Regions:
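Short, flexible loop/turn elements at secondary-structure junctions
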Residues: 16-21, 246, 265-267
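A glycine- and small-residue-enriched flexible loop/hinge signal that marks low-structured segments
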Residues: 7-202
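Short, small-residue-biased leader/transition segments that mark boundaries at the very start
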Residues: 2-4
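Acidic, low-complexity glycine/serine/threonine-rich segments
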Residues: 182-246
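C-terminal edge-of-domain segments
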Residues: 248-283
């Protein structure tokens, strides 16, 4: 376990390991680490699919190969985004997770570090897609990028005169499947992590204080104000709530000093697509 909080007084937000995350065992370890890191914190994984499988000694340089490799190797966890292929810029080749992590941080920073907006369709440092020195693949367009997105793979495409990161989904997503809503978009799960991590940061210093009615209500009020603030910023929609439920707090738990607050929140979804339908009229 990494002691990020202890060493840097910071909560891990994004975990990336360019190159290493192409190994399925490393990917699984990353997913395990970011769930309740040090017993408390949740974070998000940015991982790469390989453009060459060293174990199989085979190039992964087409859309079909990338989709099949991701599926057969279990790169489909909702706590992650997976990226393919690599990209070129200024004579260098970059793993796309590198560009994605920087872009995520930049977008988060534009919202005071609230992960309310997807890094998708944001400009990245790229002049071409890269599939390997010996690959015959000369690249693909946004339509092919959408095909990758439908399988939970985020990519890079030339769109609107810019090279951009393309795909707002987590690796869990597959078009047409009945899935868990919180894992559909990257902003969904990252916002929920932001809320739970924030709860612990705000109230961690109160642990082992006397839990009387005043403290219970104070936490309720503080958390509702936080949710209302996030809604006011556009990070949440609907009516987010926090409750202290009797059913979630049986006497046996209270006697042991264990208390639960239930938070319900709906992150604001991204504007994934828009269609204008035009019909002719002679009126």
């Amino acid at each position: 376990q990494m002691c990020i909080r202890d060493r840097f007084n910071a909560v891990l937000n994004i975990l990336a390991a360019p190159f290493w995350s192409e190994d399925p065992d490393v990917y699984k370890a990353m997913i395990s680490v970011v769930q309740k890191l040090n017993g408390h914190w949740d974070a998000f994984v940015n991982a790469d699919l390989p453009i060459y499988d060293s174990k199989a000694k085979a190039a992964i340089d087409t859309l079909k190969k990338a989709e099949e490799w991701a599926d057969s190797n279990g790169y489909n966890n909702g706590f992650s985004k997976v990226y393919w292929p690599q990209v070129q810029y200024a004579g260098k080749v970059y793993h796309l997770s590198t560009q994605a992590t920087v872009t995520m941080q930049r977008v988060d920073n534009s919202h005071d570090n609230i992960p309310m907006e997807s890094p998708s369709n944001k400009e990245i440092m790229c002049t071409a897609q890269y599939f390997g020195a010996n690959s015959e693949n000369e690249g693909f367009d946004q339509q092919d990028g959408n095909e990758l997105n439908s399988k939970g793979i985020t990519t890079a495409v030339f769109w609107g005169g810019l090279w951009v990161l393309w795909g707002p989904h987590t690796a869990y997503y597959e078009y047409g499947s009945d899935g868990v809503a919180r894992y559909i978009f990257d902003v969904n799960i990252r916002m929920l992590m932001y809320i739970t991590n924030g709860f612990q940061r705000r109230h961690g210093t109160q642990i082992d204080s006397t839990m009387d009615l005043s403290l219970q209500q104070s936490i309720l009020i503080d958390e509702q104000e936080e949710l209302d603030s996030l809604k006011g910023r556009g990070a949440l929609i609907g009516d987010p709530t926090v409750e202290f439920l009797e059913t979630a707090n049986p006497t046996s738990n209270l006697m042991n000093g264990d208390f639960v607050w239930d938070i319900s929140a709906t992150p604001t979804p991204p504007f994934k697509s828009g269609t204008a339908r035009v019909s002719y009229t002679d009126e």
